[in-house]
């Protein structure tokens, strides 16, 4: 589908009432409803927002108040997470089911009411219950406040590029069947760009996303990895990309032929249409440098110069190989914060509390499973059990018996985390255990991958905060040597960090946002297996530094 993106973008801004003097409240209605969709020769009903796949883009400006009424018309419980929005003191609007809210039940509505404070750039929203985010997701575009230009050349046009996955089967049915077996769910059947798999898949010529471009212009692409289980390379045939933002934080610009995004991450790039007029494939394919199966198929969209006929065959880009670890490490090493007077990198230099979390897979007994066991995942050997009452409500109202606050700062036993694969004694502890944090504590957290069953990369997302990725490495983290190599000047600031396969990532943040904040692997299969936990950040000393009261329409469990 071809679109005049500049016209559409300007139309949306006008429709939403943007102007330099009048940009305060943006209101949206999200109707969660079923719609029949056909992809790669298969038709099925899917859960959507407003009948759109992907769902509608939320546009706002830095400083706006956003009010989104979500009405659930489907058989499943629903909740929506606004991925990357900090929700200061307002976890009630964060969205993860049974963490900050009870889900929205069939026939009910919930008003997500939040402020966009101190943030601008590309984020996204998605369902945060079951595997419904397979089809329930969309972009969030936060424009700079009036009078604050981009810290890079003004683009001629902007376009959203949302990378996703498609299953021919009903996803929830497939997941339930896998859980009964105690096995992983099936891989997706295709990747998508803006819901379309592109012409390399059968029955997909008309399901191809197209950008019609003018020669000699600069385009801003807002790229989002909304896939459930795949890290993805992205590139454009014949064109370089200049990275200018990650996870809605400006970066020092650098040019590359391909980018890498883990699930949950966003990247903004500038693309100059300075090649000979032609049709060029934009493509995405998986990165996997561990012995784990992935949907190793390439999704394509088209960058088409104006005046070039549709009969011209597009040119394919040369993306990195699926196991190109060196590219991944080199690419991530180039990501750095701007750290300018207007956009400082406020890295905590003094650390109040150091945490060391091991990430691993396991096998637990499962009497109801066909094989008698099921796969599990854990942090510090604890597999998280979802509560039946929202954790934030239990914390706010002092409801006992819902969770414990004794999540350990370190694993129960030290071992050679990334040595030979460990395949015995793989049982994990289970529980709803949280880590209690005093307000304004500065935290350094090292996330260490382990070779329990297998090593694997893990995109970890922290709700309620951005953090600085001060260091990464391959192998076991060395607390005596590795901190000396930390970047404390201009490290990348993110909300989702990729922990390297068989390696570690160190992050720092200041716990100045009171509430209950979820942290989990953004590979949906690992989250389902329990690779998650939460922080309970205590209130500050004044009401202005404390959790706001819950809204009147707060859902009940």
From Swiss-Prot:
Gene3D superfamilies: Cupredoxins - blue copper proteins. Ubiquitous and constitutive. This is Laccase-11. The gene is LAC11. It is found in: Secreted, Extracellular space, Apoplast. Belongs to the multicopper oxidase family. Pfam families: Cu-oxidase (PF00394), Cu-oxidase_2 (PF07731), Cu-oxidase_3 (PF07732). Keywords: Apoplast, Copper, Glycoprotein, Lignin degradation, Metal-binding, Oxidoreductase, Repeat, Secreted, Signal. It catalyses: 4 hydroquinone + O2 = 4 benzosemiquinone + 2 H2O. It comes from Arabidopsis thaliana. The lineage of its organism: Eukaryota, Viridiplantae, Streptophyta, Embryophyta, Tracheophyta. Cu cation 2 binds at residues 83, 126, 522.
């Amino acid at each position: 589908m071809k679109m005049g993106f500049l016209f559409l973008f300007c139309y949306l801004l006008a429709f939403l009432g943007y102007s330099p003097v009048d940009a305060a409240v943006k209101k949206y209605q999200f109707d969660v409803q079923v719609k029949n969709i056909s992809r790669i020769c298969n038709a099925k009903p899917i859960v959507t927002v407003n009948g759109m796949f992907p769902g509608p883009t939320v546009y706002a400006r830095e400083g706006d108040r956003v009010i989104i009424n979500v009405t659930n018309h489907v058989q499943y419980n629903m909740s929506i997470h606004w991925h990357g929005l900090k929700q200061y003191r307002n976890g009630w609007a964060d969205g993860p089911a049974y963490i900050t809210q009870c889900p929205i039940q069939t026939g009910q509505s919930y008003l997500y009411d939040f402020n966009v404070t101190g943030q601008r750039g590309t984020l996204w929203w998605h369902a945060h219950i079951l595997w419904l985010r397979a089809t329930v997701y969309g972009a969030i575009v936060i424009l700079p406040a009036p009078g604050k230009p981009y810290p890079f050349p003004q683009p001629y046009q902007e376009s959203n590029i949302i990378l996703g996955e498609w299953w021919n089967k009903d996803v929830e049915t497939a997941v339930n069947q896998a859980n009964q077996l105690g096995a992983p769910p099936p891989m997706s059947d295709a990747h998508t760009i803006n819901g379309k798999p592109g012409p390399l898949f059968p029955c997909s010529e008309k399901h191809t996303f197209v950008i019609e471009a003018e020669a000699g212009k600069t385009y801003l692409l807002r790229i989002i990895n909304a896939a459930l289980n795949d890290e993805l390379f992205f590139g454009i045939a014949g064109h370089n990309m200049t990275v200018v933002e990650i996870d809605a934080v400006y970066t020092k610009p650098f040019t590359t032929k391909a980018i890498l995004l883990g699930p949950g991450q966003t990247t903004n790039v500038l693309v100059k249409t300075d090649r000979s007029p032609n049709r060029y494939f934009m493509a995405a394919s998986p990165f996997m440098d561990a012995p784990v199966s992935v949907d190793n198929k390439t999704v394509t969209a088209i960058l088409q110069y104006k005046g070039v006929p549709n009969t011209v065959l597009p040119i394919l880009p040369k993306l990195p190989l699926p196991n190109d670890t060196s590219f991944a490490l080199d690419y991530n090493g180039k990501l750095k914060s701007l750290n300018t007077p207007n956009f400082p990198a406020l890295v905590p230099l003094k650390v109040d509390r150091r945490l060391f979390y091991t990430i691993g897979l396991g096998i637990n007994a499962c009497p109801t499973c066909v094989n008698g066991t099921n796969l599990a995942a854990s942090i510090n050997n604890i597999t998280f059990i979802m509560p039946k009452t929202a954790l934030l409500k239990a914390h706010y109202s002092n409801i006992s018996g819902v969770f414990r606050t004794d999540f350990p700062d370190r694993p129960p036993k030290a071992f050679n985390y990334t040595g030979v694969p460990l395949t015995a004694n793989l049982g994990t502890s289970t529980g709803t255990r949280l880590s209690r944090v005093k307000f304004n504590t500065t935290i350094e957290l090292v996330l260490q991958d382990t070779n329990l069953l297998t090593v694997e990369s893990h995109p970890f997302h922290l709700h309620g905060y951005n953090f600085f990725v001060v260091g990464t490495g391959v192998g076991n983290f060395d607390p005596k040597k590795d901190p000396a190599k930390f970047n404390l000047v201009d490290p990348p600031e993110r909300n989702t960090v990729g922990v390297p396969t068989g390696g570690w990532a160190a992050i720092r943040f200041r716990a100045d946002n009171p509430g209950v904040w979820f942290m989990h692997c953004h590979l949906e299969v690992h989250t389902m297996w329990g690779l998650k936990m939460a922080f309970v950040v205590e209130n500050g000393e004044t009401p202005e530094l404390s959790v706001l009261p819950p809204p009147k329409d707060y859902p009940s469990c």
